C-alpha cells in the first residue's frame, strides 16, 4: 500500500519529545561499581528522527528546556549536531527542587549479566509540555509537516503531554500530515490513568496512518482482544 505525503511541507518529520541524558558506565562495568560514565543526550522519539535527519531530510523537534541549564545547552547542541531544528519553551528551574531534564541510568550488561536501566524522572521538565507553548497553526499550516511520529511514552508521561500529543495529532490530520504512532505501553506510566489514556490513545490511533506495537501494546492501550489461548 502506497502512502502519499504533503508535497509543500517544510519538514519531512516532526516529533514531540521530552529530552534527557543517559549515563552509561565505561567498559561494561555495573553502575554501582563505576566512577566514570559516558553522558549522552537521548529520547526515544529523537532516536527515530535521527534516521531521516542523517539522510538529509529536514526534521523538527518539539520539546521543553530548563532555562539557563547546562544540560539544556548540551541537548540543544546535540540536536543541532544531528541536523534537527528544535522549538520549545524555556521553563524556569524554580529552585533546587524544581524542573530538570530526566536522567537515564544505564548498565549495559556484560556476559551473563543482563542490561539494566533505571529512569530518574522526578521533576522532568518535559512533563510540562503543553499546546499553549506552540503555534500549531504555523507549524502544521504555514510550515507544513510530511509525517508526525508520536510515541506512547510521551503520550502517557503526564496529563499535559497526553493532551499535547492529542492536540498535535488533530492539528496534523487537519493539515494533511501523516501520523505514525508507536503505542509503546509502559505499565508504570498508565497506573491510575487507564481509562483516560485508553480514550486518548484510541483517538490518536483513529487519526493515525501507521500504528506500531506488539500484541500486548494493542491489547493494553486500545483494548483489542488477542487470540484465544
Question: Predicted segment positions?
Answer:
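Conserved beta-alpha-beta core of the PfkB/ribokinase-like small-molecule kinase fold
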Residues: 147-229
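A short, aliphatic-rich alpha-helical micro-motif
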Residues: 8, 138-143, 202-205
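Conserved N-terminal subdomain of the carbohydrate kinase-like
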Residues: 58-152
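A generic local structural motif
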Residues: 1-3, 132-137, 197-199
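Glycine-rich phosphate/adenosyl-contacting loop at the front of the ribokinase-like
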Residues: 2-89, 112, 131
Amino acid at each position: 500500500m502506497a502512502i502519499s505525503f504533503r508535497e509543500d511541507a517544510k519538514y519531512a518529520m516532526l516529533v514531540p519529545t521530552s529530552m534527557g541524558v543517559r549515563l552509561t558506565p565505561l567498559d561494561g562495568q555495573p553502575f554501582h561499581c563505576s566512577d566514570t560514565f559516558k553522558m549522552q543526550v537521548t529520547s526515544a522519539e529523537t532516536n527515530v528522527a535521527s534516521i531521516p535527519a542523517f539522510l538529509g531530510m529536514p526534521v523538527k523537534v518539539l520539546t521543553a528546556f530548563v532555562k539557563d541549564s547546562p544540560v539544556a545547552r548540551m541537548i540543544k547542541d546535540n540536536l543541532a549536531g544531528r541536523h534537527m531544528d528544535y522549538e520549545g519553551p524555556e521553563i524556569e528551574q524554580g529552585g533546587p527542587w524544581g524542573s530538570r531534564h530526566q536522567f537515564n541510568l544505564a548498565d549495559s550488561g556484560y556476559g551473563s549479566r543482563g542490561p539494566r536501566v533505571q529512569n530518574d524522572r522526578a521533576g522532568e521538565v518535559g512533563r510540562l509540555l503543553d499546546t499553549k507553548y506552540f503555534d500549531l497553526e504555523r507549524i502544521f499550516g504555514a510550515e507544513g509537516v510530511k509525517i508526525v511520529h508520536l510515541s506512547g511514552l510521551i503520550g502517557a508521561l503526564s496529563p499535559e503531554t497526553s493532551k499535547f500529543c492529542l492536540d498535535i495529532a488533530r492539528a496534523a490530520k487537519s493539515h494533511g500530515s501523516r501520523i505514525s504512532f508507536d503505542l509503546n505501553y509502559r505499565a508504570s506510566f498508565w497506573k491510575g490513568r487507564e481509562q483516560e489514556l485508553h480514550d486518548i490513545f484510541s483517538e490518536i490511533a483513529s487519526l493515525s496512518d501507521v500504528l506500531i506495537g506488539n500484541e500486548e501494546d494493542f491489547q493494553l492501550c486500545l483494548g483489542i482482544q488477542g487470540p484465544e489461548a
